[in-house]
Regions:
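Beta->alpha turn/N-cap motifs
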Residues: 38-43, 133-134, 150-156, 171-173
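Early extracytoplasmic/lumenal segment of secretory-pathway proteins
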Residues: 6-24
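Hinge/capping helix and adjacent helix->loop/strand transition within the periplasmic-binding protein
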Residues: 3, 25-34, 47-136, 173
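Sec/Tat-exported extracytoplasmic proteins
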Residues: 1-5, 13, 30, 38, ...
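Short helices/loops that flank or line small-molecule/ion binding pockets
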Residues: 20-32, 116-117, 121, 135-149, ...
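C-terminal lobe and pocket-closing loops
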Residues: 68, 83-84, 155-177
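Short, Asp-centered acidic motifs that coordinate Mg2+ and/or phosphate
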Residues: 33-37, 72, 147-148, 167
Length: 177
């Protein structure tokens, strides 16, 4: 951004809590026009779960939206127990709560909240297995340690291009083209 604007920008990365640490630091900083926050969808999820957290619709003014993406549920391309969403739901329902899906580890994240709504709407009981990092999450999916994967397509692009995963459900307002 510095190269585009000609303005020196000091980056102050605050890891932890899926952005909640950074949000807390940002909200404590002076509202003087010199502080800018880069944030992901977890700001909305955090507020939805705890209304004392900053409300992105009221407390933040968006300057730029850099990416709008969708989430998908993936299975291994060579999976034989189920091949599409209807057969996956039927299979999960028959497992009596023993089916698993790899997901992010942060309770209250957008991914986990959406997966909760999906399972309720589909009358499924599925264990969300938490992984802090993508590589172990994708490895567990490829290796068959979990039955499915909840992710965004950009994060698993190389696996999609290689034919390792295939989406069986897309969560988006319109069908991706």
């Amino acid at each position: 951004v510095t190269g585009l604007t000609g303005v020196s920008i000091n980056r102050d990365h605050k890891p932890g809590g899926s952005g909640t640490v950074g949000m807390t630091a940002y909200m404590a900083a002076p509202a003087d026009g010199y502080n800018v926050l880069e944030h992901i969808d977890d700001a909305s999820s955090a507020h939805a779960l705890d209304s004392s957290r900053p409300n992105p619709a009221e407390d933040l003014i968006p300057l730029v939206v850099s990416q709008v993406t969708f989430s998908q549920i993936y299975i291994r391309s060579n999976e034989t127990r189920y091949t599409d969403w209807p057969s996956f739901v039927k299979w999960v329902q028959a497992q009596n709560g023993k089916a698993t899906i790899a997901n992010v580890s942060k309770e209250g994240s957008m991914e986990r909240v959406i997966m909760k709504f999906i399972t309720e709407a589909s009358d499924m009981q599925i264990q969300q297995i938490s992984f802090d990092k993508g590589a172990p999450r994708y490895g567990a999916s490829l290796g068959g340690q979990v039955d499915a994967l909840f992710e965004q397509p950009g994060d698993v692009r190389k696996f999609l291009d290689a034919g390792n995963f295939k989406p069986i459900l897309t969560v988006f307002n319109e069908r991706p083209g």
